[in-house]
Regions:
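RecB-family 4Fe-4S metal-dependent nuclease core
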Residues: 1-311
Length: 311
């Protein structure tokens, strides 16, 4: 018997979000904010001046393929059953998605290879092991009784600054769950990693802010009280190192603080970015300066005529 869909899920799924008019409006994302905070000049070159740079890597290929495979597994798990989800050939699915995504990024990389078969095989085998552990302990990581899948890649579109109606923030949330008995929403951001996050990575506000921003904007768009929304990172490890003392898991859960202080900090950061980068007519006509630091050597504009700081 099919589960009855709670009214809150229907309301979220039927919500009509604003369409961006690219002739008169600008679209921003959290990645733009992150880049601007790292180096305003790099953001300006990429987004304002149109020198778009995207470097295809095995990590971006694996990240996309893994997300899509796990999201499909979770969709079947919640909308059908755990048994049906376990009957999926996720190994085959992951392999197909890795091939598809590699071909896609190969074409966008001017038909230049950026990995080799052995590396692709290694990432594939790592992904198979991660999904095997997740499926084995699925109720531990996701829960079943009383839980519903709101959806995967849930859209966020809104004007984050009331004085700049021409600037819209756009994003997608990896996984959103709803717990009917407590009326709670759970926002999950899936992160692929080499061997997990250490203390420094967990405390990195640049990582936290995107998830906290999604909590704030999900609340505003879908009319869910902030106190009813929980956020967490689901961090999956490609590599684990054996220990004689305890079992090392491939899955790590991190729940960052997302209360009033952090929410206000995120709001201020986004509003300041908009104020510095835009005006009511579009991009603000100012010269954004480079922020010179150790990361400059990794920048695609490093030692090019486009950046005076390193040329």
């Amino acid at each position: 018997m099919k589960k009855k869909v709670p009214s809150v899920l229907k309301e979220i799924k039927e919500k009509v979000l604003p369409q961006i008019d690219f002739a008169t409006q600008k679209s921003i994302s959290y990645s733009q904010l992150s880049m601007f905070n790292d180096c305003p000049k790099k953001w300006s070159l990429q987004y304002k001046e149109g020198h778009k740079q995207f470097t295809s890597t095995i990590h971006t290929v694996f990240g996309t393929a893994f997300h899509e495979t796990l999201q499909h597994y979770l969709t079947v798990f919640y909308e059908q059953s755990g048994a049906e989800a376990d009957r999926l050939n996720t190994s085959e699915m992951l392999e197909e998605k890795l091939r598809e995504e590699y071909k896609k990024q190969y074409k966008s990389n001017n038909n230049q290879h950026f990995s080799e078969p052995g590396e692709l095989r290694e990432f594939y085998e790592d992904g198979v092991e991660i999904i095997r552990e997740l499926s084995k302990d699925k109720t531990k990581y996701f829960g079943k009784r009383g839980w519903h899948l709101v959806g995967c890649e849930i859209p966020i579109v809104l004007t984050p600054h009331s004085k700049y109606q021409n600037v819209l923030l756009q994003g997608f949330i990896d996984v959103v769950l709803y717990h009917e008995p407590t009326n709670k929403i759970r926002i999950i951001d899936i992160k692929t990693s080499y061997n997990g996050w250490n203390k420094k990575q967990k405390s990195d506000e640049n990582k936290q802010f995107q998830l906290i921003a999604y909590k704030k904007y999900f609340s505003e768009i879908y009319n869910i009280p902030l106190e009813n929304i929980e956020v967490e990172f689901l961090i999956v490890k490609r590599k684990i190192f054996e220990s004689e003392n305890f079992v090392i898991k491939r899955v790590q859960i991190h729940k960052p603080a997302a209360g009033k202080v952090k929410l206000n900090k995120v709001t201020k950061s986004i509003e300041e970015f908009i104020e510095q980068a835009f005006d009511r007519n579009g991009f603000k006509q100012v010269e954004h300066q480079p922020k010179i630091n150790d990361n400059c050597k990794y920048c695609p504009f490093h030692k090019t005529h486009l950046c005076s700081a390193t040329y």
